[in-house]
Design a protein with these regions (language model features):
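Short helix-boundary/capping micro-motifs
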Residues: 12-30
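A short LG(V/I)-centered, amphipathic sequence patch enriched
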Residues: 42-61
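Alpha-helical linker/hinge and terminal dimerization helices associated
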Residues: 44-45, 66-88
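Central regulatory/effector-binding core of bacterial HTH transcription factors
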Residues: 92-155, 224
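A late-sequence structural motif
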Residues: 107, 258-302
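Hydrophobic hinge/microswitch elements
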Residues: 130-135, 139-142, 149, 203-259
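Flexible hinge/capping segments at coil-to-helix
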Residues: 157-195
Length: 303
């Protein structure tokens, strides 16, 4: 069966944005042409790919299957086109990175700023994911690499490199100031409201294991989707939370938050680079990866 690649390209954008009009705008085309192309694609493949409504489109199971195959190819073709137009001086190019919110906040944003200052012509595509989702994006070929926080599970074929260790601290709002002069243990935390990330997060798994190792049970009163949400909830006096020290430090210094001390030592975690060493990177991505790994090596030497 021969199907024009242009149809698959259009399908990728329609599926990505779940909207014919928006896909047409991105492709510099018009909505009737996009609709016609997708009708032709469905006819040639002899299946329905979209469920159409006034609010846009959703993928059918057949559409989901096709998108899972097309997405990786589309991203790699985009990268190939952009790399061919790049110069040796990195005046043009693109980097796609999947990252966790914590990794972005306490590590990656600073590295991106330095890189963008030196190479302003390089386009950056940053996607915010949980650690498992970020690793999956690398495995699927949807991004050049991922910057994640441990714990992380990496399968064969992918490589993980530690870039920077970090520590977390137990913090609370001003109403918990009296506790700051005490030393608590994990079992005693059951008597105080605790804020954690949701059940599916690797951070939640990390702390669940940490509590179990000390014969305590993690029972949060409030669950949040992101560390930024946790920080907002802590500042709103809704409870205590384990936060990355670099994120909490400014608020601890200003007195907006207080640090609580534990008898148990919270294990350190790491910011890590995850990439597929079987898949070559474009010039810009390779340059940025080298910058990250060199910085990580210097960090390891200072330990």
């Amino acid at each position: 069966m021969y199907v024009d690649w242009e149809y698959y390209k259009i399908f990728y954008y329609v599926a990505k944005y779940q909207n014919f009009t928006r896909a047409a705008r991105v492709l510099g085309n018009n909505q009737p042409n996009i609709t016609h192309a997708m009708n032709r694609l469905e006819s040639q493949l002899n299946c329905v790919l979209f469920i159409r409504s006034n609010r846009g489109v959703t993928l059918t199971p057949e559409g989901e299957l096709l998108y899972s195959r097309i997405a990786s190819a589309a991203v790699q073709i985009q990268d190939a086109e952009e790399e061919l137009s790049a110069t040796a001086t990195l005046e043009h190019g693109a980097i796609s990175i999947s990252t966790t919110e914590t990794a972005l906040n306490i590590y990656l944003s600073e590295k991106l700023r330095a890189f963008h200052t030196e190479y302003p012509g390089i386009r950056l595509r940053i996607s915010n994911h949980s650690t498992p989702q970020a690793v999956q994006a690398v495995r699927n070929g949807e991004v050049d690499f991922a910057i994640v926080t441990t714990p992380a599970e990496v399968e064969n074929g992918l490589k993980m490199v530690e870039l920077m260790p970090f520590y977390e601290v137990l913090v609370g709002g001003k109403t918990f100031t009296a506790l700051a002069s005490q030393t608590l243990n994990l079992k005693e935390l059951a008597g105080y409201p605790l804020i954690c990330l949701n059940e599916e997060s690797m951070t939640r798994s990390f702390y669940r294991q940490f509590f179990l190792e000390h014969d305590a049970v993690l029972k949060p009163d409030t669950e949040a989707a992101t560390t930024d949400q946790m920080l907002t909830l802590v500042k709103s006096e809704l409870g205590l939370a384990f936060m990355p020290e670099p994120m909490a430090a400014p608020l601890l210094t200003s007195g907006e938050l207080v640090q609580l001390h534990l008898q148990e030592i919270i294990p350190s975690r790491s910011i890590c680079l995850v990439y597929d060493h079987h898949r070559p990177l474009n010039t810009a991505a390779r340059k940025f990866q080298q910058l990250l790994t060199k910085a990580g090596a210097r960090s390891a030497e200072r330990k």
